[in-house]
Amino acid sequence: MAGAASPDHLFGLRYSFYVGAYQAVITGVQAIPARAALSPDALAERDSLLYRSYIAIGSHQLVIDEIGPGAATPLQAVRLLAVYLSGGAGGKESAIRKLNELLADDAVGSNPILRLVAGTVLMHERDYAGALKHTNSGGTMELLAMNVQICLQMHRSDHAEKQLRIMQQLDEDHTLTQLANAWVDLVMGGSKIQEAHLIFQDLSEKYPATCLILNGKALCLMHMGNFEDAEGLLLESLNKDAKDAETLANLVVCSLNLGKSASRYLNQLKLAHPDHMLVKRMSSAEDSFDRACQAIS
């Protein structure tokens, strides 16, 4: 008689990470029993989830300090992500150069976490074609979900739908499939907005109310013209993380539609996330306005 399968101690950590419950991941790692016999691959996955969660809550230096030069490839990649996100221009260039060196190494270049980090960094650089080069071959649900995000950023919802169909064929009920479905629905608009709202509502009943889920629900409500209820969800999200980029950006948009001042949220966004797309767009608009004023003065 075959022995019972060993428990998957990382199952809950993965899903907490997917929905943005980063503190739950950090706490959950500590709760894994010391007697749990994790394989080397499982140990690397556990640590990558842990350190990616620390990055998500802004603890970049902790990640840089704790991951040594002899760490496994996935952890080296995660450390480079922390370096990229915490550094100035020099740090970013150094991180990208080292990532490219790892990607060019036939022995480790196909590692899924390495490719995921490369895709993340290049998305920050707005090099979407370059990001897709590393993520397009898929291999994990996270990589497929990133493909959907990249295609949507490239305004190729047709390609995003193709990637979504691949995810649905693999596991229609997977949380990342549901999230990707909601992202596509939000871009498609129309009747799809209600479907996206139902997805986020379902996720909010399964998981804690994270910034990711609250912002998803709020975006749906804003698309439906319900800015007051959207504002309530966004303020709840702001209470969870006062520096969350998407919460601040969505509060700017929501406040403007409610006829309220958005300057405080915009200033917070500029301070915490100066490279955010909304900040750059508004700065560009201000520059264009100033030039127009100078031209007619």
UniProtKB/Swiss-Prot annotation:
Lineage top rank: taxon: Eukaryota
Membrane disposition: Peripheral membrane protein
Gene3D superfamilies reported for this sequence: Tetratricopeptide repeat domain
Gene Ontology terms describing biological process: endoplasmic reticulum to Golgi vesicle-mediated transport; intra-Golgi vesicle-mediated transport; protein transport; retrograde vesicle-mediated transport, Golgi to endoplasmic reticulum
Compartment(s) where it occurs, according to its Swiss-Prot or TrEMBL record: Cytoplasm; Golgi apparatus membrane; Cytoplasmic vesicle, COPI-coated vesicle membrane
Entry annotated with the keyword Repressor: no
Example of a GO MF term: structural molecule activity
Cellular component, GO annotation: COPI vesicle coat; Golgi membrane
Alphabetical UniProt keywords: Cytoplasm, Cytoplasmic vesicle, ER-Golgi transport, Golgi apparatus, Membrane, Protein transport, Transport
Pfam families from the UniProt entry: Coatomer_E
Family to which this protein belongs: Belongs to the COPE family.
Quaternary structure and interacting proteins, as annotated: Oligomeric complex that consists of at least the alpha, beta, beta', gamma, delta, epsilon and zeta subunits.
Function in brief: The coatomer is a cytosolic protein complex that binds to dilysine motifs and reversibly associates with Golgi non-clathrin-coated vesicles, which further mediate biosynthetic protein transport from the ER, via the Golgi up to the trans Golgi network. The coatomer complex is required for budding from Golgi membranes, and is essential for the retrograde Golgi-to-ER transport of dilysine-tagged proteins.
Protein name, UniProt field: Coatomer subunit epsilon-2
Species per Swiss-Prot/TrEMBL record: Oryza sativa subsp. indica (Rice)
